[in-house]
Swiss-Prot record:
Biological process per Gene Ontology, one example term: negative regulation of transcription by RNA polymerase II
Gene assigned in the entry: CALR
UniProt-listed InterPro entries: Calret/calnex, Calret/calnex_CS, Calreticulin, Calreticulin/calnexin_P_dom_sf, ConA-like_dom_sf
Disulfide bonds: C137-C163
Free-text comment on this protein's domains from its UniProt entry: Can be divided into a N-terminal globular domain, a proline-rich P-domain forming an elongated arm-like structure and a C-terminal acidic domain. The P-domain binds one molecule of calcium with high affinity, whereas the acidic C-domain binds multiple calcium ions with low affinity.
Signal peptide: 1-17
GO molecular function, one term: complement component C1q complex binding
Stated name of the protein: Calreticulin
Keywords, in A-Z order: Acetylation, Calcium, Chaperone, Cytoplasm, Cytoplasmic vesicle, Disulfide bond, Endoplasmic reticulum, Extracellular matrix, Hydroxylation, Lectin, Lysosome, Metal-binding, Repeat, Sarcoplasmic reticulum, Secreted, Signal, Zinc
GO CC terms, sorted: cortical granule; cytolytic granule; cytosol; endoplasmic reticulum membrane; endoplasmic reticulum quality control compartment; external side of plasma membrane; extracellular space; MHC class I peptide loading complex
Compositionally biased residues, Acidic residues: 252-261, 380-408
PROSITE patterns: CALRETICULIN_1, CALRETICULIN_2, CALRETICULIN_REPEAT, ER_TARGET
Length: 417
């Protein structure tokens, strides 16, 4: 049966709008993740990931993710998916990160690798396509990395995107579009966007300074000049310091013993400093010379900056001083709307309950500390009273001993009489 053209076009449109999910991981099958994620053996002392929802959460099962478990370690873990190219379509990379340990220095980013990666040998120098996510180290580094590998070179974004640095779960999203634009979102809100060509140094500049252009010798960039009619007053030059006119040689000054007496010097009240002629507008002033630019012969536009031949592996390749970070809700797709919806259905559903649980724990901890402090003060007060009672007992004992000694001495004296 032939379908009407409008209906047929509608069905085609629905099919075209269907999102493609290249990778999704929520860790909802217990230890099943260990069959999908491969540990690198490049170093024998890589840190271990464990499945955990952490010390506080919105939903104990849904919030389970990969948690770093050992301090001061490098971590290297990855999962493979069916290779795909993002040529001609949007790429969306999304995941959640929770630094519940109040991280001081460590990465919270992911890397997307091409098909050729040996997962068992993945390490910090393994070539990747894209690196994206938060990185924190001390007060100076709290940024979201967005790094693209372009023609074998890792190119960093020219903008500073600040990441979240609290203890709660946050949703990070990178969108790369086939028109060479991008968008970075945190918690489903845009924090940065723009052009790949403008915000990364992928290509040589479109314009360069004309190598043949030279500033004219008579080009005067001085806005002000000395007034040629101004002259220094005749009485201007005075010494900065003069002998103190009120000083007198001490009466007991012996020049043979003390040398020739010289009065101390003081600041000269008539000293005016260095004379400088007054300034006037320069009649020959032409402004700052601007080096003329020309088209850069080495510049060549690239409409495929955004595109990669294939993506096949998502990896966690990072360093952490203090462990405890939880990664969850990984998603790689070609559909921005689906990614936003997925974020709302995962992070969005549990974020409020997570905060409530943390607030409750903090309040319980505060009350516990108050109770411990109260108990400590009470114990100190009891110890103080016991010490005072002990001192009183010792004083009474000393007084008693003194009385006994006095009585004994008196008795002895009486016997001697």
């Amino acid at each position: 049966m032939l379908l009407p053209v409008p209906l047929l076009l509608g069905l085609v449109g629905l099919a075209a709008a269907e999102p493609t999910i290249y990778f999704k991981e929520q860790f909802l099958d217990g230890d099943g993740w260990t069959d999908r994620w491969i540990e690198s053996k490049h170093k024998p002392d890589f840190g271990r990931f464990v499945l955990s929802s952490g010390k506080f959460y919105g939903d104990q099962e849904k919030d389970k993710g990969l948690q770093t478990s050992q301090d001061a370690r490098f971590y290297a873990l990855s999962a493979r998916f069916e290779p795909f190219s993002n040529k001609g379509q949007t790429l969306v990379v999304q995941f959640t990160v929770k630094h519940e340990q109040n991280i001081d220095c460590g990465g919270g980013y992911v890397k997307l690798f091409p098909d050729g990666l040996d997962q068992t040998d993945m390490h910090g120098d393994s070539e990747y396509n894209i690196m994206f996510g938060p990185d924190i180290c001390g007060p100076g580094t709290k940024k979201v990395h967005v790094i693209f590998n372009y023609k074998g070179k890792n190119v960093l974004i020219n903008k500073d995107i600040r990441c979240k640095d609290d203890e709660f779960t946050h949703l990070y999203t990178l969108i790369v579009r086939p028109d060479n634009t991008y968008e970075v979102k945190i918690d489903n809100s845009q924090v940065e966007s723009g052009s790949l060509e403008d915000d990364w140094d992928f290509l040589p500049p479109k314009k360069i300074k004309d190598p043949d252009a030279v500033k004219p010798e008579d080009w005067d960039e001085r806005a002000k000049i000395d007034d040629p009619t101004d002259s220094k007053p005749e009485d201007w030059d005075k010494p900065e310091h003069i002998p103190d006119p009120d000083a007198k040689k001490p009466e007991d000054w012996d020049e043979e013993m003390d040398g020739e007496w010289e009065p101390p010097v003081i600041q000269n009240p008539e000293y005016k400093g260095e004379w400088k002629p007054r300034q006037i507008d320069n009649p020959d002033y032409k402004g700052t010379w601007i080096h003329p630019e020309i088209d850069n012969p080495e510049y060549s536009p690239d409409s495929n900056i955004y595109a990669y031949e294939n993506f096949a592996v998502l990896g966690l390749d990072l360093w952490q001083v203090k462990s405890g970070t939880i990664f969850d809700n990984f998603l790689i797709t070609n559909d921005e709307a689906y990614a936003e919806e997925f974020g709302n259905e995962t992070w969005g559903v549990t974020k409020a309950a997570e905060k409530q649980m943390k607030d409750k724990q903090d309040e319980e901890q505060r009350l516990k500390e108050e109770e411990e402090e109260k108990k400590r003060k009470e114990e100190e007060e009891v110890d103080k009273e016991d010490e005072e009672d002990k001192d009183e007992d010792e004083e009474e004992e000393d007084e008693k001993e003194e009385e006994e000694e006095e009585d004994a001495a008196a008795g002895q004296a009486k016997d001697e009489l």
